[in-house]
């Protein structure tokens, strides 16, 4: 019984370690460019991908985050890479 429990712990530890080591490392960049509100009627990611700044900067994703002040809707922030890579 004791060896079965030890074997289970060892196998679980190996599985956890392998999943951490084999998981892809992602660099998301910076998501701090505000672009209005996230609502059920508007997709934040699609809005950010379509939007281009005056400087010509493009975005690859959009994230909804809580606002600084209480609100019904969350805020949409666009994600971008800087010229060096991910910020």
From Swiss-Prot:
One GO cellular component term of this record is: extracellular region
Q: Disulfide pairs?
A: 31-79, 38-64, 44-76, 48-78
Report which superkingdom the organism of origin falls in.
Eukaryota
Q: Which GO biological-process labels does this protein carry?
A: defense response to fungus; killing of cells of another organism
**What's in the keyword line of the UniProt record?**
Antimicrobial, Disulfide bond, Fungicide, Plant defense, Secreted, Signal
Family per record:
Belongs to the DEFL family.
Protein name stated in the entry: Defensin-like protein 100
The record's subcellular location field reads: Secreted
Question: Would you indicate the residue range of the signal peptide?
Answer: 1-29
Recorded source organism is Arabidopsis thaliana
State where it is primarily located.
secreted
């Amino acid at each position: 019984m004791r060896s079965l429990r030890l074997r289970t712990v060892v196998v679980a530890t190996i599985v956890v370690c392998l999943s951490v080591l084999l998981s892809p490392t992602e660099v998301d960049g910076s998501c701090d460019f505000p672009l209005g509100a996230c609502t059920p009627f508007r997709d934040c990611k699609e809005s950010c991908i379509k939007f281009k700044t005056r400087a010509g900067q493009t975005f690859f994703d959009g994230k909804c985050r809580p606002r600084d002040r209480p609100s019904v809707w969350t805020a949409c922030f666009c994600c971008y890479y800087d010229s060096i890579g991910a910020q």
